[in-house]
Every structure is written in C-alpha cells, then in structure tokens.
Amino acid sequence: MKLFRCVLILLYAATAYGLAQSQSSPKKQLLVIGEEKGYRHASISHAISVIEQLGKQKGLWDTTIRTDTEPLTKKKLEYNARNLTNFDAVLFFTGGDLEMDPQQKADLLSFVHDDGKGFIGVHSAAITFTRWPEFVEMVGGTFDEHPWGTFDAPILVEDPKFPGMSQWGKSFVLRDEIYQMKLFSRDKVHVLMSLDRGKLDLSNPKVHRADHDFAVTWAKMYGKGRVYYSTLGHPEENWNDPRLQQMYAEAIQWAMGLVGPDLTRIEAQVK
C-alpha cells in the first residue's frame, strides 16, 4: 500500500510539473506578411499555408497571416487588433514598397533591433523597400538581378551545423530563382548557402558582382534581434520539398531564439 501511495504521489507530481512547464512556456507568435506591390509571386499563398502548418505540426508557434501592414506598429489598434507587441517574430514574403508610415517603419526596426525579436525574409523580401536604407541594412542586402532566372542552381552549404542546413548535405542542385544581391557583404552576415561559382555562367551580362559572391541564405544579428534571409522559395512546388520545409521551420525557431547559435559576435566584429 505504501508503495502504491508513493507511485501515485510521483505520478501527480510529474503531471503537475508537466502542466507547470506547459503553462510557463506558451507557444511563440509569428506574424506573416504576404503583400506585394508590383510583381506577384504565385507561390506566396501556398508558402504561407505551409509555414502555418509547420507551426501547428511542431506545436511551437501560432501563425497570424496578413496581406496588409496594419499590424506593423506598436501603437494600440482599434477593435482589439494585434500589433507588433503581440509577436515574437515577423516573416516577410513580400515585394515592392509596402504602405507603411514613418512611425511604422521605426517600430518595425525597433521590434528587432531593440526588443530582440526575430525577422525572417523569404525570397522576394529582398525586393521589398529597396530604397529604405535601414531596412536593407537589417536584412543584409537587397535585390540587384537574377542573372540566370529560374534554373538548376548549384548550391554549396557553408555551415552544415546551423539549424535547417544538415538535410541538404554539403552541396545540392535545386531548381529555383536565385537573386544576385547588392549592398551585401559576407563580412556583415553569417552565410549559410551560396552558389557554386565554378558551375555558373559568369559571362552572363546580368552578372554585376565583381567578386562573384552569390549568397543564397544567411543569418545575422540586428541589434538584439535575429534576422534570417533566403532567396529560396520562388517555385510553388519547392514548398512541398521536406528539405525546404525543414529549413524554414528551423529558421523560424532560430529567429525566435528557441535554438542557437548566438551570432552576436558577428555584429561586434562589424562595429
């Protein structure tokens, strides 16, 4: 009987501990903005759906989807609408100059830089606010060209230990549209993937980078916050690829601070 009582006590204690843990660790909140001004990417709707499902499957984050910029502010909104203060990270699958007033822009930068929250940029996020220097600085670069269009891109994995990289192997080929970046320097970011320049047609007249450095995916710090960008995700079918799904799922977790590594040292080196 004493043994039975001890077992019951242990079971109740374990249950109480589990409940306390779940109550003290609520799911993170992800805001996804899927708005474009100008060119429309057909893959956005499916991509956002995949991102939402990944959050549900892993039980780590809830996804709020918007096709406007109203939540990108810290001011109180009408009708109990949610704003940046309700989120742990923002994901942009966007394009063009979105409608944001100066205060909204300042709030978005502060959300990452000062509040230590996360920002994830997908593909055409690099064609967003190309003339807003602070946004370009936060992301780590901006669109210049896509010299080879959608092609069988030869990609090297530069840091296989970073979250979301190991499943790709050391190198791989993926049919996607890879952007050439300007206002980009690998000295200011942690490059995770790049094009294998030895397998590219560098005589293409749209190749503008003299260093032939074509980063595909990178991570960086912006103040206290974490920023992740990848040009992958142009074709809709790529969002059905488990490797791409895992990459973005772990990118979101990293940006939210759920997993390492801490890249603060990179920002310190830049300063």
Which sequence ranges carry the predicted segments?
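Boundary at the C-terminal end of the N-terminal hydrophobic targeting segment
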Residues: 18-22
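Bacterial N-terminal signal peptides
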Residues: 6-16
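A glycine-rich, often tryptophan-bearing local segment used as a flexible ligand/cofactor-contacting loop or short
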Residues: 97-170
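Extracellular ligand-binding/catalytic regions of CAZymes and related secreted enzymes
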Residues: 24-28, 42-45, 49-58, 67, ...
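Helical hinge/lid and interdomain linker segments adjacent to catalytic or ligand-binding clefts
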Residues: 31-33, 38-121, 125-127
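Positively charged n-region of N-terminal signal peptides that target proteins for export
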Residues: 1-5
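Catalytic beta-strand/loop cores that center a nucleophilic Ser/Cys/Thr
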Residues: 62-64, 141, 149-223
